[in-house]
């Protein structure tokens, strides 16, 4: 049984469940992956929690982990990149957690074995260097939007998706993908699970650079685990 610790945000979690279903090679109900979704949007904001010391999300994260353990889950995925800033504390609960950055790195190899990769993520994910440290250890060079671009483009687009205004997110996110491409990125990692929803609200496949979707990467990792 796969556990999904979600609600961060709810639309991204629902999209993950859809992708988990569509990416799994199945021909009947019984071929799909048994899963329990714990969707708790009450968990305090992860970016504020990490950057400002506001309400701590860790108690809510651990409550979800323990609920999934009690449901009998043998592994857990968390379709929220920033929540992985508390990965060690959650992993200490004992049930294996499939790390979203490791999953994304595996997909990235297929489109850009080495070189410069752009990272689009929340300000907290970038500040914690969740992607930069792991990917640079594996040989990539990472670039990201500037602080001003985060304030003017990326953060408002993420907020738009969280507020169910998905169509509003495409233009600023597409502009950032193009900017990272023009700065030398051979691929762009969508390292926030709201960002793929915004990018896919428009003609994302015309941007002239491969994008690596952390939701799809995590879904594929979960499928590999389940099919074992």
Model-derived regions, located:
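Non-catalytic structural scaffold of enzyme domains
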Residues: 1-228
């Amino acid at each position: 049984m796969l556990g999904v610790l979600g609600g961060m945000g709810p639309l991204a979690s629902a999209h993950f469940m859809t992708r988990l279903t569509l990416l799994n090679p199945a021909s009947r109900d019984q071929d799909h992956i048994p899963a329990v979704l714990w969707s708790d949007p009450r968990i305090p904001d992860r970016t504020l929690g990490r950057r400002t010391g506001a309400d701590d999300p860790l108690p809510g994260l651990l409550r979800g982990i323990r609920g999934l353990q009690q449901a009998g889950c043998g592994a857990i995925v968390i379709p929220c990149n920033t929540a992985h800033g508390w990965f060690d504390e959650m992993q200490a609960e004992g049930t294996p957690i499939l790390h979203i950055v490791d999953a994304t790195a595996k997909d990235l190899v297929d489109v850009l074995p080495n070189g410069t990769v752009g990272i689009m993520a929340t300000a907290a994910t970038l500040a914690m260097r969740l992607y930069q440290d792991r990917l640079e250890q594996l040989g990539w060079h990472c670039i990201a939007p500037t602080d001003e671009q985060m304030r003017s483009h990326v953060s408002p687009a993420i907020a738009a998706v969280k507020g169910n205004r998905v169509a509003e997110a495409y233009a600023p996110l597409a502009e950032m993908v193009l900017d990272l491409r023009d700065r030398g990125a051979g691929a762009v990692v969508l390292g926030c699970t709201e960002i793929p929803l915004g990018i896919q609200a428009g003609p994302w496949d015309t941007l002239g650079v491969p994008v690596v979707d952390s939701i799809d990467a995590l879904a594929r990792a979960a499928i590999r685990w389940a099919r074992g």
